[in-house]
């Protein structure tokens, strides 16, 4: 069965690259969600005034990977302890957020956060928001599959390989060939 979750963990190029490499993930789409502006575009998102976050919509096969596993990968490959920032990317559009379609998804997300918070995985408290998904807007085409199309873009070269290394180190059985 297919399920979908929307995740924001900084620049969507980075989060997208991680989940494109995960076994059981069927589709990853970059987009915008969580704000009030209708039909936002990249320029408006970058202003930080729309309320939207850069997010990815992850569609996955629940027979191959669970939502808990998706979320464990998400938390391991970005910093969920710093509000509105991932590395040099600063602003509410880069906040850590899990946008859910159901109460069950929210419960699972809160359970994963509680477990990670209690087991010492992070030195600081997790500040990731867990919210209902309202409006989601697909990002412009040039943002889709960005790293694979632009592997030598300097931002990507600097930011994405460390996240992929964490994926391979901590979740070797979940990395697609």
Swiss-Prot record:
Keyword annotations of the record: Oxidoreductase
InterPro entries from the UniProt entry: Met_Sox_Rdtase_MsrA_dom, Met_Sox_Rdtase_MsrA_sf
Active site feature: 11
EC number from the UniProt entry: 1.8.4.11
UniProt GO molecular function: L-methionine:thioredoxin-disulfide S-oxidoreductase activity; peptide-methionine (S)-S-oxide reductase activity
Enzyme class of the recorded protein, top EC level: oxidoreductase
GO biological process: protein modification process
Catalysed reaction, written as an equation: L-methionyl-[protein] + [thioredoxin]-disulfide + H2O = L-methionyl-(S)-S-oxide-[protein] + [thioredoxin]-dithiol; [thioredoxin]-disulfide + L-methionine + H2O = L-methionine (S)-S-oxide + [thioredoxin]-dithiol
Family affiliation: Belongs to the MsrA Met sulfoxide reductase family.
Function description: Has an important function as a repair enzyme for proteins that have been inactivated by oxidation. Catalyzes the reversible oxidation-reduction of methionine sulfoxide in proteins to methionine.
Protein name per UniProt: Peptide methionine sulfoxide reductase MsrA
The species this protein was found in: Trichodesmium erythraeum (strain IMS101)
Taxonomic lineage: Bacteria, Bacillati, Cyanobacteriota, Cyanophyceae, Oscillatoriophycideae
Gene name in the database record: msrA
């Amino acid at each position: 069965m297919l399920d979908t979750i929307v995740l924001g963990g900084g620049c969507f190029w980075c989060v997208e690259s991680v989940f494109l490499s995960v076994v059981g993930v069927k589709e990853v789409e970059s987009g915008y969600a969580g704000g009030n502006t209708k039909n936002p575009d990249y320029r408006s998102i970058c202003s930080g005034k729309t309320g939207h976050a850069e997010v990815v919509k992850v569609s996955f096969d629940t027979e191959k990977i669970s939502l808990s596993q998706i979320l464990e990968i998400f938390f391991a490959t970005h910093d969920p302890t710093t509000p509105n920032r991932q590395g040099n990317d600063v602003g509410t559009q880069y906040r850590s957020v899990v946008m859910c379609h159901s109460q069950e998804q929210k419960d699972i997300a809160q359970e994963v956060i509680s477990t990670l918070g209690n087991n010492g995985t992070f030195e600081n408290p997790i500040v990731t928001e867990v919210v209902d998904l309202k409006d989601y807007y697909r990002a412009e085409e040039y943002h889709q599959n960005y790293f694979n199309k632009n592997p030598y873009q300097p931002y990507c070269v600097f930011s994405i390989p460390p996240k992929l290394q964490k994926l391979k180190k901590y979740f070797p059985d979940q990395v697609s060939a």
